[in-house]
């Protein structure tokens, strides 16, 4: 009777746990079919706490799909190996892609902490796939027979690219080398996340706060207005705040007559993650460089540059340096000429031609105004954001026949806007999100990413 009770209890608990998992999947939008317009991510339903469970569930599902490919007893073919691999992992890919891009565009402390676990987890999962010898032997079997399988050009390229990915991921290494590579990849994943978190923290930590109108001498009214708005957003009404984001920093460096303030802002930017504090990245950079070299040598390359470029257009570091060398001398000569022009203006104004890095933007603007009578502020009304966007749309239409129309879909931030992109026949091509402005949780720079890439299955897009 005791055994029966224990067995009954175990069955009940298993049922309850299964129900809990099922309920979790049902309540996690990243694990559901995206029934949104055009299948875009349901940003209005996604919460930070959804990401880690979704990635973990995606990994389990992907593992089962890989296991099915490995255990398939049929002769390896394009369909049951290469195509099956290409179709696998969709749930994981969707969840991790949304997480990665949102962590770059709308990050927070919870997401950054989760990333320290999620990215190494995904890195280890990828290693478990690409370093799986049984799986690789199936890929290799198809690759070796590719010329005799009547593959079309797309199938042939996918086969070759799949094989190359396995090889570049370490599939040809010995078992001991594979274990070493796994450890390196895990460390690199963690260090990469920490580097990015530190940089974002330092970008957000510094502000140049100005509380006197006279300290804004030379700064155009439009730039002052933006700095005033930034101050209001930070609950510092009546002041002006400049940050290390390029749209805030570069205009100040270009127009401010206060050399000491230009120096302060410029040095703050230059010294990010380099002050010996908790966000200092020097040791992280050293460790990344050492691990990359170790990985490259493990893979049979003399340097990480040689490994990274082997699959790129340049092919070798020597080719890359040869191109840079061609550009270096003429670029240097032009820079010297521009420097002399700027120093001449500085000497005429101040009697001193000594020059520092934080003077460059300021005097470059003066040279431009003197030589070409060009004042960028006068162009501002013609180059408003709306005008520039419409100009891009019109040019794209003239070149490729594509059109853009505003569309109402879920977005991840109130400043984000979306457009449906249509081809010359007015057929749907995709959804384009615009997110123009810097903010504390957003990675700096001009960058873009894809939430869902185009794919065809059985001839259907």
Task: Label every PLM stretch briefly.
Residues 11-12:
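Repetitive helical segments and hydrophobic/amphipathic motifs
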Residues 1-8:
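Bacterial N-terminal signal peptides that target proteins for export
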Residues 16-19:
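C-terminal motif of bacterial Sec signal peptides marking the signal peptidase cleavage site
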Residues 35-50, 99-118, 141-183, 243-283, ...:
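Short His/Asp/Glu-rich catalytic/ion-coordination signatures at enzyme active sites or charged loops
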Residues 55, 59, 66, 126, ...:
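Hydrophobic residues within well-ordered, non-membrane alpha-helices that form the packing/core
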Residues 2, 21-23:
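Polybasic, lysine/arginine-rich low-complexity segments
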Residues 158, 190, 197, 201-243, ...:
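Active-site-proximal, well-structured secondary-structure segments within enzyme catalytic domains
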Residues 24-219:
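N-terminal helix-rich structural modules
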């Amino acid at each position: 009777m005791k055994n029966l009770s224990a067995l009954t209890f175990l069955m009940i608990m298993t049922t309850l746990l299964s129900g809990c998992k099922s309920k979790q999947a049902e309540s996690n939008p990243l694990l559901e079919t995206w029934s949104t317009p055009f299948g875009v991510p349901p940003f209005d339903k996604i919460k930070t706490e959804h990401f880690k469970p979704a990635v973990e569930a995606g990994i389990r599902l992907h593992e089962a799909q890989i296991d099915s490919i490995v255990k398939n007893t049929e002769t390896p073919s394009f369909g049951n190996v290469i195509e099956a691999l290409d179709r696998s992992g969709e749930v994981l890919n969707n969840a991790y892609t949304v997480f990665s891009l949102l962590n770059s565009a709308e990050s927070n402390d919870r997401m950054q902490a989760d990333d320290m676990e999620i990215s190494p987890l995904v890195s280890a999962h990828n290693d478990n796939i690409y370093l799986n010898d049984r799986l690789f032997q199936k890929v290799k079997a198809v690759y070796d027979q590719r010329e005799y399988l009547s593959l079309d050009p797309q199938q042939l390229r996918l086969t070759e690219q799949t094989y190359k990915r396995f090889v570049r991921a370490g599939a040809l290494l010995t078992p001991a080398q594979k274990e070493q590579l796994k450890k390196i990849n895990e460390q690199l994943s963690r260090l990469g996340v920490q580097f990015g978190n530190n940089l974002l923290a330092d970008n957000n930590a510094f502000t140049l706060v100005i509380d006197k109108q006279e300290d804004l001498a030379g700064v155009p009214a439009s730039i002052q207005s933006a700095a005033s708005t930034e101050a209001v957003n930070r609950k510092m009404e009546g002041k002006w705040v400049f940050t290390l984001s390029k749209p805030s920093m570069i205009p100040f460096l270009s127009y401010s007559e206060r050399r000491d303030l230009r120096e302060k802002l410029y040095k703050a930017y230059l010294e990010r993650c380099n002050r010996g504090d908790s966000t200092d990245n020097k040791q992280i950079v050293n460790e990344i460089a050492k691990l990359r070299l170790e990985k490259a040598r493990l893979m049979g390359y003399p340097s990480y540059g040689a490994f990274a470029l082997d699959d790129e257009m340049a092919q070798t570091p020597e080719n890359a340096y040869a191109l840079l060398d061609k550009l270096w001398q003429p670029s240097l000569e032009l820079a010297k000429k521009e420097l002399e022009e700027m120093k001449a203006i500085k000497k005429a104004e101040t009697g001193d031609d000594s020059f520092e890095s934080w003077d460059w933007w300021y005097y470059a603007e003066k040279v431009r105004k003197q030589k070409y009578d060009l004042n960028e502020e006068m162009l501002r009304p013609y180059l408003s954001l709306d005008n520039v966007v419409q100009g891009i749309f019109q040019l794209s239409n003239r070149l490729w026949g594509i059109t853009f129309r505003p569309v109402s879909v879920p977005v991840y931030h109130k400043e984000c806007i979306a457009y449906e992109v249509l081809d010359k026949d007015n057929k749907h091509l995709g959804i384009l999100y615009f997110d123009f402005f810097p903010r504390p949780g957003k990675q700096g720079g001009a960058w873009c990413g894809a939430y869902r890439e185009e794919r065809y299955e059985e001839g259907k897009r």
